[in-house]
Every structure is written in C-alpha cells, then in structure tokens.
Amino acid sequence: MAAPVRRTVAWVYGHAQRFGGDPQRIYVFGQSSGGHLAGVLLTTDWRKAFDLPADIIKGGLCCSGMFDLKPVRLSVRSSYVTFTDEMEHLLSPQRHLDHLHAPIIVAYGTLESPEFQRQSCDFAAAVQAAGKPVQLLVGEGYNHFEIVETLGHPYGVLGRAVLAQMQLAQA
C-alpha cells in the first residue's frame, strides 16, 4: 500500500498545476491504517525515491495510527500480516524522522485502545525529541471511529487543528 500512495503524491506534485492545484500546498491526512500511511508519506525520502524536493509535503495529520510496526509483528495480527525485518523498518515512520520536513499533528481519542494511544504518544514524543514541529491532540471522549468525524467540522478537534496548520483558520 505504501508504494502506490507514495507514487500518487509524487504524481500530484508533478501534475497539480494542470488541474488548478498548487504543488507547494500538499498536505496529507490519514486515520487508522491511513494514519500509518500519512506517517509513511511524511517520512519518505522524496529525493532518493523520486528525485523531488525533500519538502514536497507541507504538513500532515496522523490520527490513530501505528508508527512503529514491531508491536504488530508481536501481536495476533502476525498470523495474517507478515513482515520481514526490512519491511518492518522501512514501513515504521518513527524510524525515519530524519526525512520529516513538515509540521505534523498526531491525534488520538481517549476511548481508543491503549495501543493506539501509546503509539500516538510515542510517535509524537519521538518527533519532538528529533527537534521537529509536532502537535499532539487528545480527543477527550472520542473512540477510534468518532475522532475522525471531528475533521469535517471547522470547530472540531481535528478540523480546527488542520485549518490552523494550513493557515486557513478564521480568527
């Protein structure tokens, strides 16, 4: 899944102006597995992979994702998700923070599973420790399925944060 998503972002960057887009304003968002993929995109080495500027993504929101895949390999999921050591390393955003060139919002709800909460807190702490801009948002009273709904409202927990990150928030 990561490879086609990366190719898509590279394509959007190269073609955005053809359909009225601005390649200098690419932001990514994902929740759950999409939160993991947003993290992968934000920590991609765009120069090495696509010969593009390192900072093609200007910001992102990673909501309720997995950012270190080692625990996935140790869980019951290992019966149907098989990773090699190399895949685990390559697909763990937390291990590639040297390629993070944009502010990031990491979010989760207080009613989510402890592992989603831990992964989000650990990822945000690692980003901060790397000296990169990060905002950790905790959605009080939201579960894994409800928190994403706040993105669709400009005053919701996620909606407000994303609009501010994109400098589109109304004063």
Spell out what each predicted region is.
Residues 1-171:
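Alpha/beta-hydrolase superfamily serine-hydrolase fold, recognizing
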